Amino acid sequence: MTTTVEQTAESHVFEADVARLLHMMVHSVYSDKGVFLRELISNGADACEKLRYEAIETPSLLAADAESRIMLRLDEESRQLVVEDNGIGMRRDEMIEALGTIARSGTRAFMERIAENKAAEGAQFIGQFGVGFYSCFMVAEHVDVISRRAGSEEAWKWSSDGKGSYSVEAANLVEAPARGTRIVLHLMEDAKTYTSRWTVERIVKEQSGHVPVAIRIVDKPGGEPVQITDGTALWTKSKSEVSKEDYTDFYRGLSGQYDEPALTVHFRAEGRHEYTALAFVPGTQPFDMFDPERKGRMKLYVKRVFITDDAELMPRYLRFVRGLIDTADLPLNVSREMIQESPILAAIRKGVTNRVITAIEKLADGESETYLTFWKNFGPVLKEGIYEDYERRAQLMALARFHTSASPEGHRSLAEYVKDAKEGQDAIYYLAGGSLDQLKASPQLEGFRARGIEVLLLTDSVDSFWVVNAPEFEGKAFKSITQGTADLAQFPRLDNQTPPEQDSAGLATFIGFAREKLAGQVADVRASDRLTESAVCLVAPEDGYDRQMEKILQNAGRLQGATKPILEINLAHPVIKAIAAVEDDASYQEDATFLLLDQARILDGERPQDPRKFAQRLARVFERSVRSEG
């Protein structure tokens, strides 16, 4: 075997985003720089788990060293901290990919998130964004990574000072680990404390105490290794043996987040299928929750051997849940295809999903403030289940909380809405749009507010889909207040006013005039019982899409041409009465009619169809008004 290698080191420049990230790390003012150690240990544990998995097919990879471990070596005099694992290791190309580039958007997302938060709070985001390795530059002025892939006859060395470039060269096999990765941190002067056994051991026990790989420490050159954690898998213990702090530490190491879990679900199922599940609902919203791929973050283990974190172990609407499932009912060499098609795993998935939803239901029934925080974080995703999961739709609808016209700043349940509904009200009314402020100012809401009828205010994109897919709740159908007729005549207004008759003061004639002039742009012009303050509004035909749904489909390119809306007119509005009364100036009345349509479009969040004509008509109407006043 060749023990020395003569090869010139290759110099590489970091990607622009990585270079910016490194600059941020080097000049970091994070209050908890010790987070770097948790990240390096977590990476080492992942490498050991990957080796155990590959060794199922290729046992020779383990050779005579089957026990996974992470070794920490301290050298106070040289100001060095070494983190070494005997995991899978890296080839040259893997080293460049893992340490020199970031293929996903984690780097940019991380930096954007940091820009929005105080520096002292930033450490909690490091692992969450997949950039954990770079955190070592918070404490190191230079970093060497020597790695040897299991089963390989080559070893490689990566080096960088974190200032924009790195080098890769072949490593001397005598000095390289027999297998795995050794990270040598040449610490900054003010980071010398990380060569203290007391400091390092405290950090490990606080932040990595439940990593499923034994961790040992050598506190000085030539010293004997001392085990500081035993690598016992926390999920194999009974709940009575695990403290809240233990769960929190494990959750942080597993998820890469630095908050506390809002919910912890830990149980062992026995019977037809035996498995252990440990699932956490995060206390804060993960950055990747709205990733278009909607991938879950649950890990699958078979007999404590990590298999994959890429299986759909939970419904996609629960993708914010972090955790793992460990079962002995699957073979260790289970393939990706077998995982997706396995009836055993389907049964396990169902059982775990039911337990998580039950835990969320208990949270909703008991701790109102805690649940509202949960809902603000995860409600938009959980509502996807109302659309997708027919079996659990009723449960998920009961969990949903909404802003409403009666409680715009609070959160109401559908059960509360139904309980407080007006006598004779057979629908749950809703208004969907882009923002809460826009919805609260919507003209379509006026008639309902005037009659004390509560309306759900829906601002999430998924809302427009599930309200169509969910036929009813407790016998009441969902009805958009921007579609079809309002049918409000049966409900008296709170001020006891009655709407004007259509034929009064020539209003019927004006409606006919407007219907004729706007025939190319609207399906109809009609009197409105939903307007009390605004002059006009747009609504969708009864057999068409809701106004918001139509916009969503158009923006997604899934709708070929929009349907014509209906223009509703408030016959009691002074502007409408004034326009209708000008029967001797058809040109003015026509301009005013088109301006009313453009006004309705603007109120609906749109632009005038023809801005140039809009401006010309507005100028002519202003001119006539000035002349008539003169």
UniProtKB/Swiss-Prot annotation:
Gene3D superfamilies from the UniProt entry: 3.30.230.80, 3.40.50.11260, Heat shock protein 90, C-terminal domain (1.20.120.790), Histidine kinase-like ATPase, C-terminal domain (3.30.565.10)
Region called B, residue ranges: 337-551
SUPFAM superfamilies: ATPase domain of HSP90 chaperone/DNA topoisomerase II/histidine kinase, HSP90 C-terminal domain, Ribosomal protein S5 domain 2-like
Region annotated A, chain positions: 1-336
GO molecular function: ATP binding; ATP hydrolysis activity; ATP-dependent protein folding chaperone; unfolded protein binding
Protein name: Chaperone protein HtpG
Signal sequence interval, chain numbering: none
